[in-house]
């Protein structure tokens, strides 16, 4: 789905407060930043994640992104363990700006609070409001 010129794939779930996309596969989730989220951040030059094997809770900072104008700490409604980190994105963070839905950041195995995530059809109003605020 397109929202104000930004792509939001229908098959993903979203945590709109953090501008995070989530792909759910059984008890595994793959996590990245939305196209609008990367636009709002600007050119991303650093990605820092928890280590593989570390436990996470909904209060844990799972990863941090840095751009020239912003530092963002990301949390998710998930309890589990980091099972994979996209080393390519950590080494070359601008991949998030170039292809945000290919440039996943971490994979987590555990209990995702799916009721806290939204399909794009339910998140569209939030994304529309945020996009209108940042597009000039």
Curated annotation (Swiss-Prot):
Cofactor remark: Binds 1 lipoyl cofactor covalently.
Annotated keywords: Lipoyl
Residue ranges annotated for the Lipoyl-binding domain, each copy included: 28-109
GO biological process: glycine decarboxylation via glycine cleavage system
Record bears the keyword Repeat: no
Cofactor: (R)-lipoate
Any one GO CC term of the record: glycine cleavage complex
Protein role: The glycine cleavage system catalyzes the degradation of glycine. The H protein shuttles the methylamine group of glycine from the P protein to the T protein.
Membership in a protein family: Belongs to the GcvH family.
Protein name per Swiss-Prot or TrEMBL: Probable glycine cleavage system H protein 3
Organism name: Sulfurisphaera tokodaii (strain DSM 16993 / JCM 10545 / NBRC 100140 / 7)
């Amino acid at each position: 789905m397109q929202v104000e010129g930004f792509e939001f794939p229908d098959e993903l779930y979203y945590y709109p407060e953090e501008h995070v996309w989530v792909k759910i596969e059984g008890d595994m989730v793959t996590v990245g930043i939305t196209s609008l989220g990367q636009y709002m951040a600007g050119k991303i030059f650093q990605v820092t994640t928890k280590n593989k094997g570390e436990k996470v809770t909904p209060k844990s900072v799972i990863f941090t992104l840095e751009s020239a104008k912003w530092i963002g700490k990301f949390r998710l409604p998930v309890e589990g363990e980091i099972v994979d980190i996209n080393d390519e994105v950590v080494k070359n963070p601008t991949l998030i700006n170039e292809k945000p839905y290919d440039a996943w950041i971490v994979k987590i195995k555990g209990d995702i609070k799916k009721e806290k995530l939204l399909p794009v059809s339910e998140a569209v109003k939030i994304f529309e409001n945020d996009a209108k605020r940042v597009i000039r």
